[in-house]
Amino acid sequence: MPSDFTLKAANAVHRALLRISFGRWGTEFYGMPALELTTIGRKTGQPRSVMLTAPIVDGDDYIIVASRGGDPTHPAWYHNLRGTPTVEVSFRNGPRRAMTAHILSAEQRAPLWSRITADYPVYGDYQKRTTREIPLVRLTPVTEGA
């Protein structure tokens, strides 16, 4: 399982790659589209950003995986969006958009998890490393007047 240092370093490198290439590189990772998720820190109240992949893009919705490489604990961003589900997302280095995070129920998760692990088996490997069920989160655009 990756250490906090490794995860933070990988995020910094990913952001730097996007920045120095003016978005030409780093918009995909392992064949999945990349996005930058900004949550509000549950303890600090400050914006916190992380680079993630979206193994499923469903129209304007993105499905993200709270795997943390199969670590026994959920990633910090997952805890943050549980507290404040309104987030900002920059998809493939595009403009930031307000979105709402919906943690999927077991029934909603099952067909999507099967699809994700069929297309990207590494997620199945992550699940084998941990006893926790790896959550899936659907990000949906905030609609006007909502």
Feature map (PLM): residue ranges:
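Short hydrophobic/aromatic beta-strand or adjacent loop that forms the aromatic wall/cage
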Residues: A34, E133-L136
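Extreme N-terminal tail/first-helix region
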Residues: M1-E28
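Non-catalytic, usually N-terminal nucleic-acid engagement modules in DNA/RNA processing proteins
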Residues: Y126
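Short, structured beta-strand-loop surface elements
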Residues: R68-Y120, R129-E133, P141
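Short beta-strand-to-coil "C-cap" segments at the C-terminal boundary of structured domains/repeats
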Residues: L139-G145
